[in-house]
C-alpha cells in the first residue's frame, strides 16, 4: 500500500522455497511443527535423533510387501536429505519388496545424520561459546540497524519528513 501511494520505496521480499521440500513431514506425516508435536530434532544427539526417526508413522505392510515410496512418510523425509541417486535406490528397494520400514528408517537416519554432521557440530560449537554467540548477535544487530536506518530515511524522504 505504501508503494502504491508513494512509489517504489519498500521492497517486498519473495520466498525461495523448493517445491520438493516446501513442507517437511514430521513424525506423523503432517507438516513438521512444534504445534503438532511431531518435530524431528535435527541437531539432537545421534541417539535421540535415531530414536525420533524410528518413531515415524508408517502403514502396516509386511517386510515382503511392495511399498509405494511416494506415500511413505519415511521416504518423503529421506528426499529432503539424500541425493537423487540415493533416492532412486531406496525407491527401487521399496518397489521390489523385501525391505521393512525399520530398514528404511535406518537408511533415512543415516542420510540425515551424514548430511547434517558438519552443521550439527557447528551448531553445538556456537551454542557452547557464549562470547562468540554474543558477538554474532551484536554483528547482526548492527547490520539490521544500518539496513533499518536506510529504509526509514527513504520512507521519510518519500513522505516529506
What annotation goes with each model-predicted range?
Residues 1-161:
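Conserved nucleotide- and phosphate/pyrophosphate-binding catalytic cores
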